[in-house]
Amino acid sequence: MVPRTISIKPGQQPGPPLTSESHLTSTFQELCSNYDTAGKTAKALDYWKEVYPFQARLVLAYIVEAFTALGLELSKLQTGDSVPELPSATVPKEHHQLIRRLYQVLEQEGKLIISSESSEGCYTRTNIPVDPTPSSTLYRSLLGRFPQHDVVHELLNVIGSQLAGCLSGSVDVLHLVFGNVKNKKLLNDMYEFWPLLRAPTLLLGDVLVKAVGAHSSVNTNRPFRILEIGAGTGGTTRHVIQRLCESGFQAQFEYVFTDISTALVASAKRQFKKSFPQARMSFDLLDIEQPPKMEYLSQFDVIISTNCIHATKNLDNTLGNLRKLLRTDGAVMLVETTQKMCWLDIVVGFFGGWWLFEEGGDGRDYALIDEEDWSERMKKAGFGEVLWTEGKSEESKTVRLIGGFLGLGDVVN
């Protein structure tokens, strides 16, 4: 168990609200109305137009090659032929959800098959020819073409080049990724530096800097309290803490880093105590799917999380737990992917958290949901207002910073 050094005392009552209307809402609106500025800084713009088509072509090649190795050769099927299922003996049950998704990718991205209108899960071969270019050739031609996206391409190749083995179970994907220092770093770097994830994280840092500044100007009796859920290897943490400390607010905030992994929490504590000794940070184990700890109830001004909350069994339960941890004028700010990308299913589709939604009965048919669904669920959980980042670019619709705000009249149950 990792010892906690949190300065919030059990039973401590939250101080008075900042204003009659939370400043967090206006701060969020002001800084997040134009995603494209952050997108340009992070080099995220033009992704869908310039980069994604190459990624989709590579993903299709990985799937076609894997299916061929597992006994389903699409190129041998004639137009109008029924597309058989992969032989059940070749794919263990735990990968059946991913297989269903890969069939959808073949239909939606490659137009190689078309689903039956009368029978769910049944497909027919179309007249679109299978691209004969080997995945290895496509990968080599893509690597270095868009350097800011290479972390995704390298990680995709780690799994995609062995997709047949990963699907059949002959290759242990967890060992492939986490048992290799380079591959594990690729995954961590993707979450921290991939441009489309980086852009909303930049906006999150801006919002928190302004929020802490506004709070400290009128509240000298208590610090601004931030809780991070599912902080993992600390990619978001690092950016936020650095921005706050560079802005001179190291004494004006408390930051609680949490994760469900004892090892990750212990590692983060060593790392951040060394890198940011001036910051008021504490570290704790926290499973947001479980009933909240008593000492955390109604204690935080802002709760943040990056690509974590969707990976819970029941979003409605999780959002309700988040709400209970907030002060009456608090907010939750989530960086969440709101648009499907076919490569993502290969990169994270073998991780158990990607499919937890199937156990929770919260109405989802996929791990990710769009901003409108987030809004509906947040309001159902008791958040009075829900906002999200906007922009003119297609990239602004892909990974969003979504804010749920409590009104002062909301009572936390």
Curated annotation (Swiss-Prot):
Keyword Transferase among record annotations: yes
Q: Where is this region: Disordered?
A: 1-22
InterPro entries xref list: Methyltransf_12, Polyketide_Synthase, SAM-dependent_MTases_sf
Q: Which GO terms describe its biological process?
A: antibiotic biosynthetic process; methylation
Pathway assigned to this chain's UniProt record: Antibiotic biosynthesis
Which EC number applies?
2.1.1.-
Q: Identify the keywords attached in UniProt to this record, alphabetized.
A: Antibiotic biosynthesis, Methyltransferase, Transferase
In alphabetical order, the GO MF annotations are:
methyltransferase activity
Q: What class of enzyme is it?
A: transferase
Task: Quote the function comment for this protein.
Answer: Polyketide methyltransferase; part of the gene cluster that mediates the biosynthesis of sordarin and hypoxysordarin, glycoside antibiotics with a unique tetracyclic diterpene aglycone structure. First, the geranylgeranyl diphosphate synthase sdnC constructs GGDP from farnesyl diphosphate and isopentenyl diphosphate. The diterpene cyclase sdnA then catalyzes the cyclization of GGDP to afford cycloaraneosene.
Full protein name: Polyketide methyltransferase sdnL
- Organism of origin is Sordaria araneosa
GN (gene name): sdnL
